[in-house]
């Protein structure tokens, strides 16, 4: 940013130290041994391509990472967070360098500002922070990785709230401030309700423009900065109070624009969110939210009129039917997912600084809600790192980790830069922090708890309460050492009142299982202790916690799920070392099945079924009462809308801020359902809510339907169509003498024989099946079927196609088999084609369909990775993959370890053709299209993270983290 301001040095930042500094205990590290020396490091080549075009968009060779970091995580960190120009000496090349520049900056500032009791404590702080970042226990938000320790301004905050008044100077300054924040890759939100409506008069006697008119200018500015090369799409939030006279126009803005997008798309224009033609449509760069009051919601309940208030005079200038207005809000959200809703009285009832001013707005993702002209820096814990081997939650280490993280976050405010003087001043005076978590969905599944269950909600609430209670307790301790935040004295009564509300909610909570009871017990202790210390010292921070979407940083930590979200789907898309990709079953699933008491044989069968079908419905051996544990955000068994809302409500009372989360609804959801979600959100005490009905957006890739051939010569298209309508195939007959193998089998007690003949190169060319007595109907049908399959193979139909079509067909006989590789079969056809796949398809092709030998499955259960079983596979042997040495580091980096050999991954195969992300894999397996946008950098389909979208290929996000 070109304009930056550090907070003024005050007693709350740099000045006198009130008490002895912190004593830092070791959690994970060993005295006398640096964390880097405890792990194995390897060098990798990071090459990133645009998946759709094949263009190489990034390449850096010989980068250094711990061997347990995934390819995806290392790619994202290398492309997003390594500083310096690629190919230059100042370019970072190791994760060590990235962590060191951040951690050493924090440690130096902590010593300078009096946070530590001794140099030894500072060293322990440095080592523990390094260990946790290296082991993906937590991560700071993206601006920390972008800026800290570099020559750039030390911006650490991802979330900003601005303000605008009813003057032209203020409105034009809003455009400028927002633009500077977007330039730095962050997001901002503000409330436009102070601006006079288009129904009011100016002092000169003319009619006011109204806030919706000024939104056009801000939207165009954001779109221009995005097009000018910002690190990601501009993230912005626009809020309008429900009593504003222009509220109906505000609600309908995006609905009208979606109609335009639909018309332009059907005419053949490129209306993807990154498309060249989308810029002609307005209001596409912001999330819109309506701020509703309790007064309005009660009018809605009672079917009463509600007054719209003039901004200048404060008089009611129009009355509307509250039910009709709320219905219009739900209809707009049904049509285009905007606007969301924010509950004003609930937000301000939990406000710790009421004497300073009201909370009027939020950041773009809606998790940070605080004073105007303020900011918040975020960090998120990876909850799966606290799941112990015995299945319990590691309360002790979670508390210690939270203490350390919240301390480091507060230290960052001491040296941080800000985009405006007003934001710098407010942040220095109130020191808002936003600690949160990711991987909740994975933790619940691994613990055998359904996301939409009392047990799941209880554990989520307990962890949230423990996190926030510990953070505020440490904040109170810091206040005794380096002083309370400057605004505390003015707001002492209000802050203490909110602390007691959190405490009361924690004590009122009831444990549901032994898993959450220990967490609740510790949370109660933390709140009790924190309030006792806070009433003596005050608190260092006005806010401590939020639940952010954790888009990019969630991928950096190798999280299966983001923020508070459930798992997207049970089958994922995984990048492999050296290139290529494969389809894998979520690694949490085998762990969950074992915890539920299933035998290894059944675990293997269920995992194999999920790999092929993408869901657990009718999985062999899985009890129906366990189905809900594996429910996901999308798919055959998706979590209900109210399941999402109730999970948010379970956590909301234990957060300083709010929750970035979108409530997903199926495409056939009604307006009434959305109306119910918005109403129940208010009743359950949420602060904000957004909904997303599948396929409600039409700004998506132009691939099918009208306009797909825009610009194509009609004669050429017709000729191509005619050619494709009459394909010419040549039959490749088998030689007179050919190798074959006969397999005897039994499925559900029914026996049969299969003879498979091959070409000289080992490729399958014919199949003969012997079932039933000679002359029987069954025998005749199977003979005819064998001939059809054999002729298809000889005319070039891929075996993969037959396997995909015939495996998992269900009919009798079905059940146990006598084949160790295929323990359960849904039918004879299911067994036959899975056996053919194991015998005649290369490993890469069958692994993409989730088909493995018994040896391969056992190895995966032991090591977490599928590798080919060369001894049992009889498929044609392809050329062995090359072993590649990554280039040596430059001489100036002589301290780096020797390069390890990385085996190149198999090439992409037919089964993963057309798939570049987990979202696209879900679409292929389910047959359901998503309208998620394509990533503007690498071309793959993004997935939802909170109320934003994130690209799991390169880490780009439309949000703040």
Please place each PLM-identified region on the residue numbering.
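Extended catalytic cores of very large enzyme megasubunits
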Residues: 1-790, 794, 803, 820-822, ...
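Acidic, low-complexity intrinsically disordered tails
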Residues: 7-12, 703-745, 846-937, 945
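Hydrophobic alpha-helical membrane-spanning segments
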Residues: 686, 690, 837-845, 946
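Residue-level signature of catalytic and energy-coupling elements of molecular machines
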Residues: 749, 832, 947
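Phosphate-backbone binding interfaces of nucleic-acid-interacting proteins
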Residues: 772-857, 862-871
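Short cysteine-rich clusters marking metal-coordination/redox-active sites
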Residues: 935-938, 951-954
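Short Cys/His-rich "knuckle" micro-motifs
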Residues: 944-948, 961
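Short Cys/His-rich micro-motifs in 6-15 aa windows
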Residues: 955-961
